[in-house]
Design a protein with these regions (language model features):
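Short coil/turn segments at the loop-to-beta-strand junctions that recur within blades
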Residues: 21, 63-71, 110-116, 150-156, ...
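Short beta-strand elements that form the blades of beta-propeller/WD-repeat-like
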Residues: 37-42, 85-91, 124-130, 166-182, ...
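A short helix->beta-strand "capping" segment at the edge of beta-propeller domains
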Residues: 2-26
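Conserved blade-ending motifs and adjacent loop-strand segments that build the rim/top face
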Residues: 192-222, 248-280
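Short loop/turn segments that connect beta-strands within beta-propeller blades
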Residues: 53-55, 100-104, 138-142, 184-188, ...
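Repeated scaffold domains used in trafficking and secretory/extracellular systems
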Residues: 27-30, 73-78, 113-121, 155-163, ...
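Blade-loop segments of beta-propeller domains
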Residues: 18-23, 27, 57-84
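Asp-box/WD-like beta-propeller blade repeats and closely related beta-sheet repeat scaffolds
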Residues: 73-75, 90-134, 147-156
Length: 324
C-alpha cells in the first residue's frame, strides 16, 4: 500500500538556486548543509562546490582544478563534519582536501588508492571503495584500517545515490552485494537491517554473474537506501527501487509502503533531519506539488515567474522529516 506523506514528512520547501556568471550549475551530485547554508557539489562539467545562503543565493565556490596543493582533476564526493563545518572533499588524483565552512583551503591528505565515497565521524574518516565493496577508516595519524568488506559483485556505484547516510549521531552505509543496511561502530560495523524485495534471490544471482544494463537492469534493480529514521527503538528507512518506498519496523518485522514523492528525477540525500532532492526549474509545478504533498506544510517559491521557469536552474526540494 501507500503511506500518507504527512506521517513521514513534516514540511517541504522548494528552494530556487540563483546563479551568476561564476556559479552556474549544470547539475547536482550531492547536497549538504551547515549553519543555515547549503553546499552543492556539481560534477556535470567542471567539478566545483558552491555555497548558498538560506535564500538560494550563491555566497562562495571552490573551483581549483590543477595539480598543486588544494587542486584536483575531479571531485568524487564530499562530506561535512556537523560539529565544525569542516568539509572533507574526496578528489582525483586520489587525495582528500579539507576546507573550512567558508570554503577556504586548510590542508590535504594523499591517498594510496581511489575511493568513491567519504564520510567524517569522530573516529576518523570513512572511505568507501566500489571496486571491492569495502569500507576503510583513516585515523588521525593517517593510518588506514579496513572495517568492512563483502563478497565481490558486479557492482556499480551510482554517482547520484548515497552510500554513507548520517542520521543523528549514527552513520549508516549500504552496499548492494549484501542487500543490508549497516551501522558504523567505534570498532567496525554491524548489521542494522536486512531487507527483502521482489525477485531478491534472482537479482542477487544476476548481479554476481553479469553487469546488467537496459531493461535487465530495470527488472533486477536493487534498493538504494537514501534515508534512515529512528522512532524510539524502531528503525525505518526510505529507499528507491524504481519508485520511492519506506520500510518501517514494527514488532521486530519490516513492512514496506510506497511513498508518493514522485516528480523528483534525481536521488535524494539526507542532511540533518532533512531529505533533499532536486529538480530543474522547468519541471517545477506548484499545482502538482500541492497535490503530491497534500496535508504537508508546503513552502513554495516566492515571486515565481516565467524567467525563473525558463532559466533551467536547479531547485532543491527539502523534505523535513516528521521523525528522525
Amino acid at each position: 500500500g501507500t503511506i500518507p506523506n504527512d506521517s513521514i514528512i513534516k514540511s517541504v520547501e522548494f528552494l530556487y538556486l540563483h546563479d551568476d556568471e561564476q556559479t552556474m550549475l549544470g547539475g547536482i551530485s550531492s547536497v549538504d548543509s551547515f549553519d543555515g547554508r547549503w553546499y552543492v557539489l556539481d560534477n556535470s562539467n567542471r567539478s566545483k562546490i558552491v555555497m548558498y545562503d538560506a535564500e538560494g543565493r550563491p555566497l562562495n565556490r571552490y573551483d581549483r582544478t590543477g595539480r598543486g596543493p588544494g587542486e584536483y582533476a575531479e571531485i568524487t564526493d564530499c562530506d561535512i563534519d556537523p560539529a565544525t563545518g569542516r568539509i572533507y572533499v574526496l578528489c582525483g588524483p586520489p587525495k582528500i582536501i579539507i576546507l573550512d565552512s567558508e570554503l577556504n583551503f586548510i590542508r590535504e591528505i594523499p591517498l594510496t588508492q581511489f575511493y568513491h565515497r567519504i564520510a567524517y565521524d569522530n573516529d576518523g574518516i570513512l572511505l568507501f571503495s566500489g571496486y571491492d565493496s569495502a569500507v576503510d577508516r583513516m585515523a588521525g595519524d593517517g593510518s588506514v584500517k579496513r572495517i568492512f568488506e563483502t563478497a565481490k559483485d558486479a557492482y556499480y556505484t551510482d554517482s547520484r545515490a548515497p552510500v554513507f547516510i548520517r542520521s543523528g549521531h549514527d552513520i549508516y552505509f549500504q552496499t548492494e552485494p549484501s542487500d543490508s543496511l549497516y551501522r558504523i561502530t567505534h570498532t567496525g560495523c554491524e548489521v542494522a537491517a536486512a531487507y527483502d524485495y521482489m525477485n531478491r534471490e534472482e537479482a542477487q544471482a544476476r548481479h554476481r554473474t553479469e553487469s546488467l544494463i537496459g531493461l535487465k537492469a530495470m527488472e533486477y534493480v536493487r534498493p538504494k537506501v537514501l534515508c534512515v529514521m529512528r522512532d524510539g527503538d524502531n528503525l525505518s528507512f526510505i529507499y528507491n527501487r524504481i519508485v520511492y518506498n519506506v520500510s518501517m519496523e514494527y514488532n521486530g518485522e519490516y513492512h514496506n509502503f510506497a511513498l508518493n514523492i514522485a516528480g523528483l528525477s534525481n536521488a535524494l540525500a539526507m542532511t540533518g533531519n532533512k531529505l533533499v532532492g532536486w529538480i530543474y526549474s522547468h519541471n517545477y509545478d506548484p499545482d502538482l506539488a500541492a497535490t503530491i504533498y497534500d496535508g504537508v506544510e508546503l513552502h513554495e517559491i516566492d515571486d515565481w515567474d516565467d524567467a525563473k521557469r525558463e532559466s533551467g536552474n536547479p531547485i532543491l526540494v527539502i523534505h523535513t522529516l516528521a521523525k528522525c
